[in-house]
């Protein structure tokens, strides 16, 4: 009888071990790290994804000599439509009601009615058929913000309120909701995360350095609302028009 009991115990131990391994594999947290180049869809070292508000757009930024540049089409689409490239004269122009501000491609200076100013960086340049403009130069005439990180550039053009929460415990920010999803970055206890979307057990969040991923709800403290501070550095000029109290005749008077 003893050998039979021993055999049964061995079977139970083996079965329990196998079951434990299955449960461990199913519920343990993955330590796999996500590929940032793949996540941000950047294949060249001088390119960075653009996060506009809370979404990654298809356009990308160019990082050259530690300066962030956007192509002119991106500037027109998301930031400011007034910039104009004169490809014949090799000029980047910006017009307001009182003056035309100009800079030559490849130069660090720009000219206004007050004279020539040096920006300290190449303001614009051309590669192929594409005109690139320095993000800081765009900011001289546009109310928006940007911050450069390792593989991405965070851009804000609109402001309102946002939901935030502090982490109650160190945790991994994952590519998707789920313990097996690859890790994008690590967040520490006390870090403030922006809550983009809350689900049953996971929330889509944004870290202070604008990494968007997922954390478990049980790691989050109380959710509160914050009012964002808009950028108002640039005072847009007033576009005035002529008015008259009397009727204006646009025709030509004929002699009587």
Question: Where are the regions that the model predicts?
Answer:
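Short, compositionally biased
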Residues: 206-219
